[in-house]
UniProtKB/Swiss-Prot annotation:
Domain of life (superkingdom): Eukaryota
Biased composition (Gly residues): 292-302
Protein name: Regulatory protein MIG1
Composition bias type Basic and acidic residues, residue spans: 73-89, 484-495
Protein's organism: Kluyveromyces marxianus
Zinc finger annotations (C2H2-type) as residue ranges: 32-54, 60-84
Polar residues composition bias: residue spans: 224-233, 446-458, 498-525
Known function: Involved in glucose repression of glucose metabolism genes.
Compositionally biased region (Low complexity): 303-313
Gene Ontology terms for molecular function: RNA polymerase II cis-regulatory region sequence-specific DNA binding; zinc ion binding
InterPro entries: creA/MIG_C2H2-ZnF, Znf_C2H2_sf, Znf_C2H2_type
Length: 543
């Protein structure tokens, strides 16, 4: 018995993507073929989705705000949207965590923004704090300079206070020696002590120096320019105070003595250095019976204020001549008015009365100087006048040594009051008398008085007793310096700074006559007013 085994034939199966016929069976139709891999698809959507895998196109995008995912299939997009729509989406692990991280990221972004704002605010605050801290640092750097400035300021204030106290004590000492008008002068002296600093510095300097070095000439001239600009603002105050002093002293002088005299106004040294006080001469009372052109007041009472002259330091080309000539033209000077001696005690007045130069009261009439303080060609020559022409000279050698000693110049200036006190020690033989013109002169062998033309005549009285003492010493002392008289007065520079009419302040005895009277009687056509420094000691010779 033999049997044959016939194997079973397997049915042919269709492989995906291939229209292969197996065992004569034809697979279903796949009309949609992939152009890239030649794969066939039953539907067009499947072919399109397959082609997107080759091209990488993802047309389906998530429209949730903040989500930028895109998908190639629509079903993937719908599944993705579930994540955004549901709070707890189902699906794979990590989706829940991923959604939480997205929310946290948003919160973190908000926190970062807040932190940035806070940082900006902190930076601004730090910048402001740094700016405030820079200012104290700069102040600390400049603190030493400020301390040094404070020390300098305190030193200046202390020095000013010391000088102010010295000035007050000086004024109180000078007021104790004054006459009955010291009560009114004490208040004015206090006002003098509180004037401005430039005026005090200028007042502390002497009006004239005796025999200084040649090197001081340049410094004096530069000081003149620097001080003059400051003196212009403060000069009016000084003039008003001098006018007030003049008015207060005038009333007391008229009660005590009817004759005009001069008073020294010793301005206190307001600086710490030992500089001598300046001397200014102010007429105490106007001349009785003078016209409108006479007297320092000139009818308005402001003459003394407007006629305040200022003597500046002088070079030393001719120290003896300049000093003694200045003292000569300032005679007679007295610090305290004294009653005049009677006419009977002066034998020379009897001789003067015989010539007709005495008034009804027995006093000698004085001759006022010209405004120009110079002889207008009518003065007698030295040979004609003799020793009586020099009416103002010193006789005390100690006084002249003080004037010419450099050490005494540097320490303190020689005041005229000191010289007059030393004159009182002279013997009675050296006393001089008053001539018919009211001017003192030394006794000489020739008894012929000096007479000037009527053009220079003036009317008034003078203190004869003080004139004798002062002028006697000056007359004897000028003999030692006559060898310098040959030099011309024009060679010297004018160092005398005058105001508009300073001659009425510094003129002894009386004020000068008016220019109208002088021009009508004098032979000169024009009258110039040279300074006091430019005058010679001896009168010029007549030609």
């Amino acid at each position: 018995m033999s049997s044959e085994v016939v194997p079973l034939q397997k049915k042919g199966r269709k492989k995906a993507g291939a229209g292969v016929v197996v065992d004569g069976e034809k697979d279903g139709s796949r009309p949609y073929m992939c152009p890239i891999c030649h794969r066939g698809f039953h539907r067009l959507e499947h072919q399109t989705r397959h082609i997107r895998t080759h091209t990488g196109e993802r047309p389906h995008a998530c429209d949730f705000p903040g989500c930028a995912k895109r998908f190639s299939r629509s079903d993937e997009l719908t599944r993705h949207r579930r994540i955004h729509d549901s709070d707890k989406p189902k699906g794979k692990r990590g989706r829940k965590k991923k959604s939480e991280t997205i929310a946290r990221e948003k919160e973190l972004e908000l926190q970062r923004q807040r932190q940035q704002q806070q940082l900006q605010q902190q930076q601004q605050q730090q910048l402001q704090q740094q700016q405030h801290q820079v200012l104290p640092a700069e102040i600390k750097i400049s603190a030493p300079m400020a301390s040094s400035m404070m020390e300098v300021t305190q030193a200046i204030n202390q020095r000013y206070q010391d000088t102010h106290n010295l000035s007050l004590s000086y004024n109180s000492g000078s007021n104790s020696n004054a006459s009955s008008g010291s009560n009114s002068n004490s208040s004015l002296n206090q006002v003098f002590s509180i004037t401005s600093q430039p005026a005090r510095d200028l007042a502390a300097k002497p009006m004239f120096q005796l025999g200084s070095d040649e090197s001081e000439e340049t410094s004096n001239t530069t000081t003149l320019h620097s001080v003059h600009s400051q003196q212009q603002n403060n000069g009016s105050v000084e003039l008003l105070l001098n006018a007030a002093r003049f008015e207060s002293e005038k009333s007391t002088t008229l009660l005590n003595n009817n004759t005009p005299s001069f008073k020294f106004i010793d301005r206190p040294p307001l600086t710490s250095s030992l500089s001598s006080p300046a001397l200014s001469l102010v007429s105490q009372s106007p001349v009785a019976g003078a016209g409108p052109g006479f007297g320092p007041a000139n009818g308005n009472g402001n003459g003394a204020a407007n006629n305040n002259g200022l003597l500046l330091p002088r070079p030393t080309s001719r120290p003896k001549l300049s000093a003694l000539s200045t003292l000569k033209r300032m005679t007679p000077l007295s610090q305290v008015s004294e009653p005049q001696q009677p006419a009977a005690s002066l034998p020379h007045l009897q001789q003067v009365s015989s010539n007709g130069f005495l008034d009804t009261n027995g006093h000698a009439a004085s001759v006022a100087r010209n405004k120009s303080w110079t002889n207008l060609g009518v003065m007698p020559s030295p040979s004609e006048s003799g020793s009586s022409a020099l009416v103002s000279r010193f006789s005390s050698s100690a006084s002249l040594n003080k004037l010419m000693d450099p050490s005494s110049r540097t320490s303190s200036a020689v005041s005229i009051a000191t010289l007059m006190n030393e004159d009182k020690l002279q013997s009675q033989d050296d006393l001089s008398v008053v001539d018919e013109f009211g001017r003192s002169r030394k006794k000489s062998k020739t008894s012929t008085p000096i007479r000037r033309p009527s053009s220079n005549m003036g009317f008034g009285t003078g203190p004869a007793s003080h004139a004798m003492e002062f002028c006697n010493e000056l007359q004897s002392r000028l003999k030692s310096v006559d060898q310098y008289s040959d030099r011309s007065a024009g060679d010297e520079k004018d160092y005398y700074f005058q105001s508009r009419s300073s001659s009425s302040v510094c003129t002894p005895i009386n004020s000068p006559p008016s220019e109208r009277l002088v021009s009508s009687t004098s032979n000169n056509k024009t009258i110039k007013l040279p300074s006091l420094r430019s005058l010679d000691i001896l009168p010029r010779e007549q030609h």
